Amino acid sequence: MGKYFGTDGVRGVAGADLTCELAMKLGRGAAAVLTGSTGHRPRILIGKDTRQSGDMLEAALTAGLCSVGADVESLGVLPTPAVAYLVKKYNADAGVVISASHNPMEFNGIKIFAGTGYKLPDEVENEIEKHIDNNCADIPLATCAEVGRVSVRADGLDDYVDHLYEAIHGDLTGLNVCIDCANGASAAVAQKLFPRLGAKCTFLGVSPDGANINKGVGSTHLDNLEKAVVAGGFDCGIAFDGDADRCLACDELGQEMDGDKVIALLALAMKEKGRLDGDTAVVTVMSNLGFIKYMESQGVHTEKTAVGDRYVLENMRENGFAIGGEQSGHVILLHHATTGDGELTAGKLLKLLAESGKKMSELNGIYAQYPQVLVNVTANAAQKAAYKEDEVLAGFIENEQQKLMGMGRVLVRISGTEPKIRVMVEGQDLEAIDRCAKRIVERIEQRILKQ
């Protein structure tokens, strides 16, 4: 991670950490790095989620881009994966998404896609950061007719829905589904796509007001969806986050289906049809041991990366694998998309359910998960830095790992998108791992929270 860019773009509290000044510099730096050698007037797409701060940041970002001669096409509110798809379809030089994904509304973020539709590699982000630190002093400003123009593009929604419809290529007739759009960017797409595929749909979280994105709804608040599914007698529930790059589900009994379960089901379906390249699924170190063991028993190898869908994608592209993702619900289907796409994932999962003739609870029960305890410790940048340098703390955590005697594992990591240190302990004995997690959290708080 760099000074400004985390694992998923630049992110922070809008107006405090992520200011208009920073957004403008980011626009200038990105335009210079991404389009400096194109030899033509660059075109940049901008999409956003439903946060109140999105308009403010889009205006600042647009000013930065236009000030160095780039034309901007505003797509309005669209999911992150829609921008990734459209930047390539429209032959644009880059695409920018203004969103903080699953975070509360006070946060916002800026993530950038190259003209290929893929997120920027670390080295390109580092070049942009150098320009920001230099106040973009070495980037010439456009004048007169060289200044970029701004236009609104209204066809993005329908073009993206058409793409998803063709990629899913399924008939969902007979399914009764409850879909939670998190009061975010997925609402317009979902309300067009899933009924078109034949599903009977009831929608939650489709009334964004700028402040209610992810507020008690969406993939980070599944309890409301789970209750609604049981009370309404739905076949299953689907939940997206604020920018719809992730998808979680629940079965008809209200039981959660995390990203591991979704990846397992889709990967095995692909394997059965001969489409699972390398018979491999790429996941992160957070994936459940029950998932890993089950996939191995089914002849599917699992590649494990650091946490972050960008690292999953890098492994997939380097090795030619077709599916990967995270327990949190990011699922990348590389035959159809260049990034995690919640609505594509949901469509593929619902197609599998419709074709199986089974209940979702039967699909959800394909393997038993090992118990996991996940605790988040709030930590600012200085406290995160102190954690990384604390050898005593590292030794304590290693000792806790040894106490599990090979019957579990400990994973403590710094979040790249939130001011948190995440403590995850996994094993067969829930009481033992719960005690272990509490000891680690207590020691972290004792040693670094004074920073």
Across the structure, where does each feature detected by a protein language model lie?
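An N-terminal, well-structured beta->alpha segment
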Residues: M1-A63, S67-V68, V150-L175, K384-A385, ...
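Short glycine-centered, acidic/aromatic-flanked micro-motifs in structured strand/loop junctions
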Residues: G47-K48, I179-C181, D251, H335, ...
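Proline/glycine-rich low-complexity loops and linkers
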Residues: A82, N126-V161, E166, E252-G325, ...
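N-terminal small/polar loop signature for handling phosphorylated ligands or for N-terminal nucleophile
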Residues: A32, G36, H40-N108, K192-C250
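Short glycine-rich phosphate-binding loop at a beta-alpha junction
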Residues: G39-D49, E73, N176-C178, D279-V285, ...
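Gly/Ser/Thr-enriched, mixed-charge loops and adjacent short helices
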Residues: V13, N108-G232
